[in-house]
Every structure is written in structure tokens, then in C-alpha cells.
């Protein structure tokens, strides 16, 4: 097996990360990394990705719209969802509850990282180049 979510969490870069939900999925292999910049991200992923987001793409959507987006992501069988904390997002508590529900149902790891942590420090993605 290749590089897994557990391998990613074991990296020094992720020492301040917090695994919120989906611990049962940390053995999933990572096949790529994608930043969520728009709600239609599901069109551009094939599965196995780690998705990075500050939830900005979902800033103003309703909880119902957000539930639909997350359901589509779950169908794609992403390897993990990494959420950068500290963003102001409408209905944040409701949206996090939706993420928790799907993470527990599908075992998709949800990892929270501090706001000040850079998403891609130099050299951090070298493990995908092997």
C-alpha cells in the first residue's frame, strides 16, 4: 500500500492537527491532494484524494445545500477532509454537524488544522512524487 492518511498524520507538519472524526479510515491510501475552491469540486475528483478547505467555498450556502455537497463528496470516497480552522462561515455549527455525520457514517477522516498552519509548506508534498 502507498502513502496513507495515518502516514500523513505522522508527519511533523501535522503535529498540531486534530483528527476529529473517521478514525477507522486512517488506513486509506492517498492518491492526491485537492483544494476545495468551489462547491462543484466533486466534478474534478476521482476518489482517494485528501481535500483541503477553509470552508470558504461553502461560505454562504444553506445547511441543506451543504448537506448535498458533502453527500456527493462521500460518494467519491475521498481519503480525508482537512479543514483549516478560523474562518467565518455562515451556519458553521450546522455544517460541521453534517461533516461529522458523514464522517462517522463513511469513516472518512476529518482533520482540523490551525489557522496559522500553511496548507502546503515547501517540500510537504514530496511524498506524492514517488
Question: Model segments located where?
Answer:
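Alpha-helical/coil-rich non-catalytic "connector" segments in signaling and regulatory proteins
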Residues: 1-130
Amino acid at each position: 500500500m502507498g502513502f496513507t492518511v495515518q502516514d500523513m498524520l505522522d508527519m511533523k507538519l501535522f503535529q498540531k492537527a486534530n483528527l476529529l472524526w473517521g478514525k477507522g479510515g486512517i488506513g486509506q491510501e492517498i492518491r492526491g491532494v485537492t483544494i476545495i475552491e468551489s462547491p462543484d469540486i466533486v466534478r474534478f475528483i476521482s476518489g482517494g484524494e485528501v481535500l483541503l478547505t477553509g470552508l470558504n467555498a461553502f461560505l454562504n450556502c444553506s445547511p441543506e445545500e451543504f448537506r448535498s455537497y458533502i453527500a456527493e463528496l462521500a460518494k467519491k470516497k475521498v481519503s480525508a477532509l482537512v479543514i483549516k480552522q478560523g474562518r467565518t462561515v455562515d451556519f458553521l455549527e450546522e455544517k460541521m454537524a453534517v461533516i461529522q455525520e458523514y464522517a462517522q457514517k463513511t469513516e472518512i477522516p476529518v482533520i482540523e488544522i490551525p489557522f496559522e498552519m500553511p496548507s502546503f509548506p515547501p517540500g510537504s508534498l514530496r511524498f506524492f512524487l514517488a
